[in-house]
């Protein structure tokens, strides 16, 4: 997966196209990510210990990883991600600027 938790991404397709946010969680087995403030859904919650009232709660739902693009740390624009070996370690590289991401 080309993105991971804590990365700043931009949504490139879907109802939230153009929105930017930070990845809260990544689910590699399902190829999905949870992005802050994107794909908000309303969930009906039964009363429980944490929420004695119950009711309808708004929360983020996961979106497919192919619908997001990493934001280049140098230019602030969406970029594709490449990989290269640096000092014996595999690092992510922004295709647009060539900047090392992590």
Swiss-Prot record:
Annotated function: One of two assembly initiator proteins, it binds directly to the 5'-end of the 23S rRNA, where it nucleates assembly of the 50S subunit. One of the proteins that surrounds the polypeptide exit tunnel on the outside of the subunit.
Q: Does the keyword Transmembrane helix apply?
A: no
| PANTHER family for this protein | MITOCHONDRIAL RIBOSOMAL PROTEIN L24
**Which family is this protein grouped under?**
Belongs to the universal ribosomal protein uL24 family.
Q: What is the lineage of its organism?
A: Bacteria, Bacillati, Bacillota, Bacilli, Bacillales
Q: Which UniProt keywords apply?
A: Ribonucleoprotein, Ribosomal protein, RNA-binding, rRNA-binding
- The source's domain of life comes to Bacteria
The gene is: rplX
- Subunit structure as annotated in this protein's UniProt entry: Part of the 50S ribosomal subunit.
Q: Which InterPro entries match?
A: KOW (IPR005824), Rib_uL2_dom2 (IPR014722), Ribosomal_uL24 (IPR003256), Ribosomal_uL24_CS (IPR005825), Ribosomal_uL24_KOW (IPR041988), Translation_prot_SH3-like_sf (IPR008991)
Gene Ontology CC terms? ribonucleoprotein complex; ribosome
**The protein's name in its UniProt record:** Large ribosomal subunit protein uL24
- Pfam families, from UniProt? KOW, ribosomal_L24
Recall the GO molecular function terms of this protein's record. rRNA binding; structural constituent of ribosome
A Gene Ontology biological process in which this protein takes part is: translation
Does the keyword field hold rRNA-binding?
yes
